[in-house]
Amino acid sequence: MHRRQRKIKTDTVQPFLSIVIPAYNEERRLPGSLEKVLSFLQTRDYPAEVIVVDDGSTDNTVGIVEGFMARYPFVSIIKNDHRGKGYAVRTGMLAARGTYVLFSDADLATPIGEVDRLLAFLGDGYDIAIGSREGLGAQRINEPGYRHLMGRVFNLLVRLMAVGGFQDTQCGFKCFRREVAQDLFQRVQLYGAEAGLAKGGMVTGFDVEVLFLALKRGYKVKEVPVQWHYGANTKVSPFLDSARMFMDVLRVRLNDWRGKYKGTGDRG
């Protein structure tokens, strides 16, 4: 049974949903991903916005997004210097106007329709809903066994050193109430306002810091099993990026010991 397609609302009122997509040299994957996002939004009866944050791409990523902007007024782009995914996500989350704000990887490894599952929990009183590739109901499709094993080892380290209680902190599909996103992403230290320039594709452990701060701030976080597709053209380097993410976990713990997150528990 197919849903009747609707014209996507582009009112000047506050969007119900903001979709933030960080992009670095995504000229090949982004057109298909944006078409899928737009097709999904045509089946939903609420105003929305799509924000692509270009992370200093050297290909035609910006031109592709500008082509969509010419046809869809609710699609926009923010152009950053190349400072990495964490900084790009932060930029988009702070710029978003929606009641709820989702960030999603540019390849849509988690299908955009899975946002319905996250929104259900936000509507039920949670502050943050994070997509998870683990747990009952989660689906990991076409992922090599060694990649899964490395992910589980990293998650164990995250649990021991920074954020306990989550089976998957790294799925690039997380949704926040807007005021919560504003609070948390203004407080991040690793890839915040002072983030330096990056070299090449840069996958980081920024998610761990965001969740660490969320728990310190007393926010309610729900881990939601989702479908996730492994892409053969993934930009994640299993060794280099794993090492960088591990160092980020250490930096979160070190920042906490140094008192850089002091006072984050006082929400009033």
Q: Predicted regions span which residues?
A:
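N-proximal low-complexity "stem/linker" segments adjacent to membrane-targeting elements
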Residues: M1-S39, Y46
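Donor nucleotide-sugar binding loop of glycosyltransferases
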Residues: E26-R29, S57, K85, P111
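Acceptor/aglycone-binding surface of glycosyltransferases and processive sugar-polymer synthases
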Residues: F74, N80-A95, Y100, I112-G200, ...
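Hydrophobic helical membrane-anchoring modules
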Residues: M1-F16, L156, R187-G268
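Short beta-strand/loop segment that forms part of the nucleotide-sugar
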Residues: Y46-G56, I78-N80
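Acidic donor-diphosphate engagement hotspot in glycosyltransferases and nucleotidyltransferases
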Residues: S33, T61, V89, G113-V115, ...
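A conserved acidic beta->alpha catalytic loop
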Residues: D54-G63, L108
